[in-house]
Design a protein with these regions (language model features):
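Conserved hydrolase catalytic core segment
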Residues: 71-110
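Flexible "cap/lid" loop of the alpha/beta hydrolase fold
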Residues: 99-128
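Alpha/beta-hydrolase
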Residues: 119-180
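Short beta-strand/loop motif that positions the catalytic acidic residue
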Residues: 185, 191-193, 197
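Conserved alpha/beta-hydrolase "acid-adjacent" motif
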Residues: 198-204
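Catalytic histidine-centered segment of alpha/beta-hydrolase-like enzymes
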Residues: 199, 217-227
Length: 227
């Protein structure tokens, strides 16, 4: 993990293809905040435990905060990290000052009748060559430019996490719908989402906003994935 800056603690739960190196995305904020970015299970130096569920990932985050003697944080969940950030806020509201969801996975407004068993980067693309070979297709299909693709490399240090996101984290809010009672959330929430985001479904986000008890929804007409 990376722990940098001073001020209010911003605990970043990175998305797919991420890791502690995503601190670079927030380097201009380090003069105002203490930013902590841990690698989630299977990403950049973090092992993959037998229980790789969102709930167990939250347990690992709590252990880290206890080690750092940090009582409460602002949670910043982005992309696939949104599921874990939401789970964290539901299970440990006493440790959360506020929840920020940025171009992220969203809970369902109603329990879905079906869901995919794998929702993420196909396994054959979870390597440097595969990602490089198909790099030009990501912009029109997913809104991810070459610079973003380059920031994901090397894939071999993120592959286990990417597959776990697709097989476990990204489907958990559908598979275990009742474990995400958003209407009981006790923390203030800020959601930022672009309508033209090709990765995080704007309509799903918009439909679920009313379930958040205390939520501000920032909508951008354009900006795409991660604005």
């Amino acid at each position: 993990y990376v722990d940098s800056g001073k001020g209010e603690v911003l605990f970043v739960v990175h998305g797919i293809c991420g890791g502690y190196d995503k601190i670079d995305m927030m380097k201009d904020k380090q003069n105002d905040y203490r930013i902590i970015v841990p690698s989630r299970f299977g990403y950049l130096g973090s092992e993959m435990p037998s229980d790789s569920s969102p709930s167990n990932q939250v347990n690992a985050f709590i252990e880290l905060l206890d080690k750092l003697n940090i009582d409460k944080v602002f949670l910043f969940g982005t992309s696939a990290g949104g599921t874990i950030a939401i789970k964290f806020a539901l299970e440990h509201p006493e440790r959360v000052k506020g929840l920020i969801l940025y171009s992220t996975a969203a809970p369902f407004a109603e329990k879905p009748s079906s869901y995919p068993k794998y929702a993420g980067v196909p396994k054959f693309l979870t390597n440097d060559y595969g990602l490089w070979l198909f790099r030009h297709f990501f912009k029109p299909m997913k809104g991810m430019d070459a610079q973003m693709i380059h920031s994901m490399l090397p894939i071999k240090e993120r592959r286990a996490g990417m597959i776990n996101d697709a097989a476990v984290n990204n489907i958990d809010m559908a598979k275990n719908f009742d474990d995400y009672p958003i209407e009981t959330l006790k923390v203030k929430t800020l959601i930022a989402q672009a309508k033209d985001d090709k990765m995080a479904d704007y309509n799903q986000i918009a439909n679920s906003v009313s379930n958040f008890p205390n939520c501000k929804f920032l909508v951008f007409e354009t900006g795409g994935y991660l604005l």
